[in-house]
From Swiss-Prot:
Record-linked InterPro entries: Cyt_b-c1_6, Ubol_cytC_Rdtase_hinge_dom, Ubol_cytC_Rdtase_hinge_dom_sf
UniProt protein name: Cytochrome b-c1 complex subunit 6, mitochondrial
Membrane topology note: Peripheral membrane protein
Composition bias, Acidic residues: 19-64
Gene3D superfamilies xref list: Ubiquinol-cytochrome C reductase hinge domain
Annotated function: Component of the ubiquinol-cytochrome c oxidoreductase, a multisubunit transmembrane complex that is part of the mitochondrial electron transport chain which drives oxidative phosphorylation. The complex plays an important role in the uptake of multiple carbon sources present in different host niches.
SUPFAM superfamilies, per the entry: Non-heme 11 kDa protein of cytochrome bc1 complex (Ubiquinol-cytochrome c reductase)
Location of the protein in the cell: Mitochondrion inner membrane
Oligomer status and interactors: Component of the ubiquinol-cytochrome c oxidoreductase (cytochrome b-c1 complex, complex III, CIII), a multisubunit enzyme composed of 10 subunits. The complex is composed of 3 respiratory subunits cytochrome b (COB), cytochrome c1 (CYT1) and Rieske protein (RIP1), 2 core protein subunits COR1 and QCR2, and 5 low-molecular weight protein subunits QCR6, QCR7, QCR8, QCR9 and QCR10.
Pfam families in UniProt: UCR_hinge
Family note: Belongs to the UQCRH/QCR6 family.
Source organism of this protein record: Candida albicans (strain SC5314 / ATCC MYA-2876) (Yeast)
Phenotype upon gene inactivation: Leads to decreased vegetative growth on several carbon sources.
Gene that encodes it: QCR6
GO cellular component: mitochondrial inner membrane; respiratory chain complex III
Amino acid sequence: MSFFRDLLESVVPTAYAEEPVEDVEVEQPEDAPEEEVSEETVEEEEDDDEDDDEDDEEEEETADPLDTLREECTKTAACKPFDHHFHECIERVTKEQEEPDYEHKHYKEDCIEEFFHLQHCVNDCVAPRLFNRLK
């Protein structure tokens, strides 16, 4: 019978919940002095925080070349009309959403088509430049 039990356990593993951890309170005698935090310890902790902030600033300075290339390509002559149509559509949809009967309209315009045209143009412009920079 143990063979079948072992076979079943190997196919269908059983997980057991962990036993609850008992909270053990450490009692301190009433006449024992409490630990005092020295000024040196506080100053050291502040210095560590400043070092962490400097590291974060260094990381933020390195910009993603893809984002900068996308912005540049959006402003090119080839992609400018697509960007213009996309922003016009956004304005039109936003204005339409402010109308009182917008919720009851049968057709609600979105700017997905304009967005995809813009992204297609930007991606065609970015791809060769990005791979040259990454080499």
